[in-house]
């Protein structure tokens, strides 16, 4: 069966820039994919890598694909292409074949409630107040906060104010994007390890400090993120939490 592949670039500005320890993200860009078979069935996919090096690899992979190709060739590409390209093509093929989407007998599964991402720094408190007003309270909500974006003393003060405002049923995830050193990460873990609202510290140390990550995980909950991208073998061996993004793997 021959499949026709169309690609369209997209780029849009985020409503609010995302500050992380690695810098500031102001826009998202990628490709919208459309697959069509000989019977007119259509499937859609998206390729939206986060890292610049991923974007270049995806650009090259998509540029190498012909506009028409046999399904067997496409399936071979899925196994060899960069993760975001494999996901986008796989999603389009799955919808075209009726595995997911309107043609599927099961339809789409309901998405779980996401964690609410709070802005980094002092803007976090006003965003928390706005969330409480819009949701009628903060009970049973999960919040994610980017840390290691400002001086540690300021962030520790903001943490205490945040903890004062969160009810006992709320959950908290702190994402350092590898921006802490060992002493800073340990200080945060010691402060939070006995707080039942803590889900985890996400990528508290740099990818290169795997020993430090393992030592910190012995003190409290640690989730790996960037480490899994650069060392995929950890997806099988890491016994703690893992932040997984199928769209990028």
Language-model segments: what does each one mean?
Residues 145, 150-249:
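Catalytic core of soluble alpha/beta enzymes
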Residues 1-172, 177-179, 190-195:
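N-terminal capping/lid subdomain adjacent to the active-site entrance of alpha/beta enzymes
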């Amino acid at each position: 069966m021959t499949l026709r592949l169309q690609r369209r670039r997209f780029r849009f500005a985020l409503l609010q820039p995302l500050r992380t320890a690695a810098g500031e993200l102001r826009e998202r860009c990628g490709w919208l994919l459309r697959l069509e078979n000989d019977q007119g069935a259509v499937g859609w996919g998206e390729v939206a890598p986060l890292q610049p090096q991923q974007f270049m690899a995806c650009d090259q992979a998509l540029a190498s694909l012909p506009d028409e190709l046999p399904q067997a060739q496409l399936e071979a590409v899925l196994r060899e292409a960069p993760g975001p390209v494999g996901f986008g093509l796989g999603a389009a093929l799955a919808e075209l074949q009726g595995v997911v989407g309107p043609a599927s007998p099961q339809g789409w599964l309901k998405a779980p409630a996401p964690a609410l991402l709070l802005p980094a720094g002092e803007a976090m408190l006003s965003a928390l107040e706005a969330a409480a007003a819009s949701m009628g309270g903060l009970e049973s909500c999960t919040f994610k906060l980017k840390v290691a974006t400002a001086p540690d003393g300021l962030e520790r003060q903001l943490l205490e104010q945040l903890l004062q405002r969160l009810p006992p049923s709320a959950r908290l995830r702190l994402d350092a994007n590898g921006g802490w050193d060992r002493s800073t990460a340990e200080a945060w873990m010691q402060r939070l390890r006995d707080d039942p609202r803590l889900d985890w510290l996400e990528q508290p140390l740099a990818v290169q400090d795997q020993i430090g990550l393992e030592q910190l995980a012995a003190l409290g909950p640690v989730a790996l993120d960037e480490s899994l991208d650069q060392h995929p073998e950890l997806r099988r061996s890491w016994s703690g939490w893992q932040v997984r993004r199928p769209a990028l793997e």
